[in-house]
Amino acid sequence: MSSSASCALPARYEAVRGARQFTSTTLTQWNIGERFDDVALVVSELVTNALRHALPADTPRDHPLDPPVRLHLMRWAGRLVCAVRDPSPDTPTARAAGEDFAAESGRGLFLVESFSDSWGWHPLAGALHGKVVWALFRLADHP
């Protein structure tokens, strides 16, 4: 079985809550709600990173980009992928081993790596600018 769903997210931090709600609704519809906690944490971190790092501080919160951040959820063959598209071409970088994990910020990709089975990113090409950062979750057998 394969399925996909996506939503546009406004360039405001309130979008993180909307992304979690969208994820909850989608996973429930796909009958894989038992993975919600891990997936929601990862989605929250990916969306927060997109909003914090991909949009410059001087970007108006109602920026005309349509949309500046987009969440995609894709399910197929025992896998779930959460992908967040943003307008920045900058490479996402996880905190290096030995860095201060007690700091208030900077742990997002470490959490993504810890709670997903794998993660990565790729630049967008063509008319789309920016990148997609994704996380993969292996699912138990589901119809």
Predicted regions and their residues:
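Short glycine-rich, polar/acidic loop-and-turn segments at beta strand-coil junctions
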Residues: 23, 43-45, 75, 86
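Histidine-centered phosphotransfer motif of kinases
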Residues: 38-56
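Bergerat-fold GHKL ATPase/HATPase_c domain
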Residues: 1-41
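Conserved beta-strand-loop-beta-strand hairpin that lines the nucleotide-binding pocket
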Residues: 1-4, 51-143
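Generic leucine side-chain signal with a strong bias for well-ordered alpha-helical environments
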Residues: 9, 27, 46, 51, ...
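Residues within well-formed alpha-helices
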Residues: 18, 22, 46-49, 115, ...
